[in-house]
């Protein structure tokens, strides 16, 4: 059955990468194939934590999409877009850097999917006002979100999985990974001009933006206050996850329910931002990856890679980092990390007498988080961003994303390798 699972996954992946077939249709067809053959059962799909649909991701997306849909009715995105454009004096590069910094910071405190859902509408409005292409801005922001999410325990789902298995705390992530994330973020900003080239804006467009009054963009101040109060509660619950142990998906759904109750909006108004295609694509992708996990393909690949190290902790850390990045770029990093954590735990236990035994855990988290930038389906935030871009009339192809993402991933992993080497194997001794 492993051959069948691999064949279906590779065929689906090739079709998705070709950009010639609707990716949601491909994902659902591939999912149907692994069920019919049968490689995976309905119980595996709906109830298994390891091989099933990640309902936490699905419901987090639904909740945050509804919250964004309600928030859009207030005009706050227009306000933020005008404010950002005016503070940057209409310079596309300065606007991009500002939005990149906001995306990275927000992803460290929330999660990168939520960040993309909140920042993307602002980006679309800024680009519309200046009459410039949105694709460069959206890609830069999702790169920053995946990088920023590595900084904290709650920033990226793989970090939560690693922390749970390794017994690491919120403060551990802040102490060990945040310094590297700052370095990688600076490197990302430095390569932005080379990555996306120069973006020109017509002078009259800049003059028009500078003449705008952002205060006039707010259409419903009462609803904005209600949204602000709910968002504060939602964000606080996200940050307090290590203490409250309330799943982010439940928090998002509760927040969405509260806003629906107090907003007075119609069903079509608050559901207008729900990306149904994106949700179905995720479901299909989770099912196909679940088939790879169930048949032992991912486990066999990971075990073969880690056995090459011969028990040396330095080699183990670098191999985990190097293997995690490309694999996380090909399959979603959540099921990959869920599969790898038992193996890393076993390796750490065997090497217990060696110094820096937590380093393989940091290598796994960094490889999975940074590797998410490699391809368009490497991280949940990427898929969400592509869906938003498509609906906005500015679709981003799989290969366009991958060409840029490969550069960002290579720089990030190179800096991560240097950081791990210096901090844990040179300066520590």
Swiss-Prot record:
CDD domains: P_permease
GO cellular component, one term: plasma membrane
Pfam annotation, one family: CitMHS
Highest taxon of source: Bacteria
Regions that span the bilayer: 26-46, 51-71, 99-119, 135-155, 173-193, 223-243, 278-298, 311-331, 361-381, 407-427
Subcellular location: Cell membrane
Keyword Ribonucleoprotein: no
Topology versus the membrane: Multi-pass membrane protein
GO MF term set: arsenite transmembrane transporter activity
Keywords recorded for this protein, A-Z: Cell membrane, Membrane, Transmembrane, Transmembrane helix, Transport
Family (UniProt): Belongs to the CitM (TC 2.A.11) transporter family.
Protein name (Swiss-Prot/TrEMBL): Uncharacterized transporter MT2758
